[in-house]
């Protein structure tokens, strides 16, 4: 029974103080990387060393925290930054900074006797209002290649090379396009476009992943397209015996999976069968059309009641199976790099012409028009392949991190727009939140209002960090100057507008950040505030921990 024993630390003040110190230590390390003048961090793992300026990479590299407090702070902050990275591709350092600042400021209120859960309510409320401000007033859509270049350059830490490559790639794959980032065999970074299709469906289970990045990479797979829910285990047995004999990876695309079916597929994957399952794209009639599109791209056929094909049909007719050169599946989406030798060009052209004919219908509603445009884009666009080169393996890995983040940042910006960078958007929201609080203070309790102020005041920290990393010794003075400049420009205007005036930290001159191309992805700003607030509030509500004691080491007798 000893291995199930737990230890409860009931001294709340000691718990919070130790976690507070741990969170600050973690944040200080990550914050060094913020902004154009941020420092690199050396990651050392035995004889292997790696240099990075990527906040989330630093967080992921801390694998053995020394104390329970370190583990708690790291787990909460890293989870928040991971979520920001997954949704926006950028803003991970800002998420870490914001989460820690909320915790540090909130700690002072806790020691004064305020209720942590009510503080949390105020923090979360302020975060929700702030996110809406970005969507409603502070973001602008990406208009052209110049905007794409600027977003990519900021996310890639000022790399003109990466920004130009991504601009070229997105000009060819479109805003819904996908790209595969890989290491090159040379010192050059290059890109190319291959024919394929992207669908917004990811791994049905993380157990299907084949690499450390949580992706399933299937080379020359067989593809099974099933426009119905898989619910009868017996239907799979004979067809899958045949598929296993082909000695090729298997991608299953189906409307849905009963738990028993999915568990069986996962179990077979664990036992060595190279299989991956995803959901079919979209719903209803739209799903039927998209499955037929997939059949054209993969050279296969759709199994469904409408086509009259069943799983057993595979045994006598293997032409039902589709294929591809490669399929990459992550948690969110699937990229199919087509094997053009199996595509019926006449069938493909006819399909695109059918969609064009549908789009000519002036009575088409907005939903059907959007679906038709998406289908056409997926049928005619390609997939970007970016091969990252460098003089050393360490340089290649560092550059690949930047390309991954910049691609995701541009992709999210094309969907949600961009905002002024350099921390200015957070400063504009800071003022707007205080204006909101002045009008609605009666609606909040004392603790909730304090939590609201904690979040608002914490929004100045990203700017202060970027400013400090540039070598400025008086960051508070710089903050005051920038706030006064932008407040004066907007005057008494009650409408919330983006702040755009900031000091160029390299030259010291006052500039318009939009004109200088200093921009952030709106999605990154939104996710930073959402996840930073969640993490900071989580830490504030902590009162103790339960831990399993380490197993005693058994000394071997000589």
What spans do the regions from the language model cover?
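Long, structured protein-protein interaction/assembly regions in large complexes
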Residues: 63-64, 128-420, 545-558
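Residue-level signature of catalytic and energy-coupling elements of molecular machines
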Residues: 19, 35, 89, 113, ...
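Glycine/serine-rich anion-binding loops at beta->alpha junctions
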Residues: 6, 10, 84-94, 418-420
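Short, flexible active-site-proximal loops enriched in glycine and acidic residues
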Residues: 85-97, 111, 116-119, 133-145
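Metallocofactor- and cofactor-centric catalytic cores in central/energy metabolism, strongly enriched
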Residues: 85, 116-117, 121, 125, ...
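Helical mechanochemical/support elements of P-loop NTPase systems and associated helical scaffolds
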Residues: 15-18, 22, 26, 38, ...
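Extended, low-charge hydrophobic alpha-helical regions
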Residues: 17-19, 64, 69-71, 270, ...
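Generic N-terminal targeting/processing segments that precede catalytic cores or assembly contacts
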Residues: 1-83
């Amino acid at each position: 029974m000893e291995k199930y024993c737990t230890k409860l630390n009931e001294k709340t003040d000691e718990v919070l103080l130790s976690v507070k110190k741990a969170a600050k230590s973690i944040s200080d390390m990550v914050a060094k990387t913020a902004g154009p003048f941020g420092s690199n961090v050396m990651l050392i793992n035995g004889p292997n060393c790696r240099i990075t300026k990527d906040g989330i990479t630093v967080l992921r590299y801390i694998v053995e925290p020394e104390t329970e407090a370190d583990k708690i702070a790291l787990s909460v902050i890293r989870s928040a930054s991971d979520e920001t990275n997954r949704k926006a591709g950028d803003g991970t350092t800002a998420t870490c900074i914001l989460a820690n600042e909320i915790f540090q400021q909130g700690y002072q209120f806790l020691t004064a006797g305020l209720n942590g859960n009510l503080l949390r309510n105020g923090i979360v409320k302020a975060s929700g209002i702030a996110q809406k401000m970005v969507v409603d007033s502070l973001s602008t859509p990406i208009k052209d290649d110049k905007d794409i270049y600027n977003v990519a350059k900021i996310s890639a830490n000022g790399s003109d090379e990466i920004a130009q490559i991504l601009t070229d790639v997105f000009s060819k794959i479109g805003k819904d396009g996908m790209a595969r980032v890989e290491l090159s065999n040379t010192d050059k970074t290059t890109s190319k476009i291959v024919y394929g299709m992207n669908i917004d469906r990811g791994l049905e289970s993380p157990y299907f992943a084949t690499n450390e990045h949580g992706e399933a990479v299937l080379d020359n797979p067989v593809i099974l397209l099933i426009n119905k829910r898989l619910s009868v285990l017996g239907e799979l047995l004979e067809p899958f015996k045949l598929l296993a004999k082909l000695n090729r990876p298997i991608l299953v695309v189906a409307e849905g999976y009963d738990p028993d079916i999915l568990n069986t597929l996962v179990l077979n994957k664990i036992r060595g069968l190279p299989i991956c399952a995803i959901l079919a794209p979209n719903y209803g009639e739209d799903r039927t059309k998209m499955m037929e599109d997939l059949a054209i791209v993969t050279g296969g056929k759709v199994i469904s009641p409408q086509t009259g094909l069943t799983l057993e049909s595979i045994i006598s007719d293997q032409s039902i199976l589709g294929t591809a050169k490669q399929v990459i599946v992550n948690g969110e989406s699937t990229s199919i790099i087509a094997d053009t030798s199996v595509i019926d060009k006449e069938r493909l052209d006819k399909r695109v012409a059918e969609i064009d004919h549908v789009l000519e219908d002036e009575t088409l509603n907005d939903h059907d028009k959007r679906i038709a445009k998406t289908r056409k884009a997926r049928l005619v666009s390609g997939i970007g392949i970016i091969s990252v080169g460098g003089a050393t393996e360490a340089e290649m890995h560092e550059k690949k991190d930047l390309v991954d983040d910049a691609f995701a940042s541009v992709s999210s910006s094309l969907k949600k727009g961009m905002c002024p960078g350099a921390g200015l958007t957070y400063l504009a929201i800071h003022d707007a939140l205080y204006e909101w609080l002045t009008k609605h203070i009666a609606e909040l309790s004392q603790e909730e209002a304090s939590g609201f102020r904690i979040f608002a005041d914490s929004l100045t920290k990203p700017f202060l960090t970027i400013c400090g990393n540039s070598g400025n010794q008086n960051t508070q003075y710089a903050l005051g100057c920038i706030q006064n400049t932008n407040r004066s420009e907007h005057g008494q205007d009650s409408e919330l507008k983006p702040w755009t005036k900031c000091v160029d930290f390299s030259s010291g001159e006052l500039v318009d950040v939009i004109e200088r191309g200093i921009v952030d992805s709106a999605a990154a700003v939104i996710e930073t505030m959402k996840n930073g607030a969640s993490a900071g509030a989580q830490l504030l509500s902590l009162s103790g921990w339960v831990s399993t004691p380490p197993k005693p080491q058994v000394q071997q007798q000589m």
